[in-house]
Amino acid sequence: MPGFRSITVPAAADDPALRGAVWYPCAEAPAAVDLGNVTKLFGITVTGAKDAPITGYMLPLVVVSHGRRSHLVMHHDLAETLADGGFIVAAINHAGDNYFDQSRSAELSVMLQRPTEIKRLIDFMLTASPLAATIDRERIGVFGFSRGGHTGLALLGASPDWAGRADYLWKPSSEWQKQVRDAGFPRRDIAHDPRIRAGVIADPLAAFFTESSFADVAASIQLWASERGGDGVTLESVAAVGRCLPTRHEAHVVRNAGHFAFLIPCRQALAKAVPEICIDPPEFDRPAFHKRFNADVLAFFQAHLVGAR
């Protein structure tokens, strides 16, 4: 059963501290863990033995990147499944692009900041976290959804082609148009992390990628697409990512699903607070899908981080 603990990745230079959480294998009995404002506002709790000792040694690590204006807890059922399967799972709230702090959500620079934050999370987990001595640094994976999918692809070696996607950035409807007009395209390179050997990418925002963006991607990838899409992601945009990947990958299309199907099934309080992420087509069963999805993600990471050791 999973253990659970909160973490804080320390501030670095001009980068703020990052609040996060870790799930991990544990022998103690789990219980519902109150998450403060998240529980109060949305009725969400996680299942785990809070701050209990970890079970195991040389365990694989999976890091998680959430979507735009979201929260690390929105993938907690997957984290619990992976922890039950022998993985350490670490997630953060991206600075300025999470539910409780949206101050940088509309800034193009946040797309560069996000991969750097996940690299900082990995650094922390391997060197300064209470679980550092139990992690196998040769077995690291990433899960990313939506903007977090863009983050995951970048970490795996993909590079945005700002000039190549100028048509998108300059569209009058683009939230980025004024920023590009005033400041030009981003000038610093996006962060890659060769320590990451496998990635599960769900409905990634792919608007800044072109065919040449993926030349340096060599890791094993499981790519998920919702049939109906949403929030700037379409079935075709995800399929285009798959066609551009230079190595073989595992691809899944979730029939009848919208973009937010990859988020946890909604309880009443969450559905009332943020209804747009909780509405599914009548023919789609999100809880049933998550049982299959979580199992498939676990099997992929077991094959590529455990079995391939």
Give the ranges of each region predicted by the language model:
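Short, solvent-exposed beta-strand-terminating loops
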Residues: 19-36, 150-166, 250-271
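Short substrate-entry loop that stabilizes the transition state in hydrolases
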Residues: 44-59, 64-101, 229-234
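Alpha/beta-hydrolase active-site loop
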Residues: 107-138, 150, 154-159, 164-180, ...
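Short beta-strand immediately N-terminal to the catalytic nucleophile in serine-hydrolase-like folds
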Residues: 142-144
